[in-house]
């Protein structure tokens, strides 16, 4: 298994899901840099919300990912691997993966896909609370344009992820420890424990 794919709309709290498996000893974290972080006090305390590379239109990598299924496996993997220099399983996360779940499943059948879901309204509300277009990493303005387009995009992305969870009979997990085990990686240290139910997040692995 080379990759763990993560798909979630803006505001789905998918970054917290990624963060709390990112510290598994089996994960390649060489895509991390201080420039690829974002901190905010939306949770009530200033903390790290975004870390590592985000792939997608108008982002640092994956600008063409809306058309992911029109590229070869080799082209996709070159873009996945570009920010990494280490070893281990690589977490590849993109908001637009929800449009391409069938292609990802067919092309990388041995790699888990993690689908992160909250209601459309909850996603938009949380994304706004976290800074909306003032979020400094990743940058959203060039692709999502304005709140109306962001709201529509969240609905589209969530719809794709929910359909995939139904189509592939996904397994719902309730903590990051369960997620790590289902994905076949070592469980991170106890300080990274996350209860998805308490966090109002639905996490499904297909």
Regions found by a protein language model. Give the residues of each.
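PAPS-dependent sulfotransferase catalytic core
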Residues: 1-79, 181, 189, 193-206
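A generic local structural motif
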Residues: 74-82, 99-102
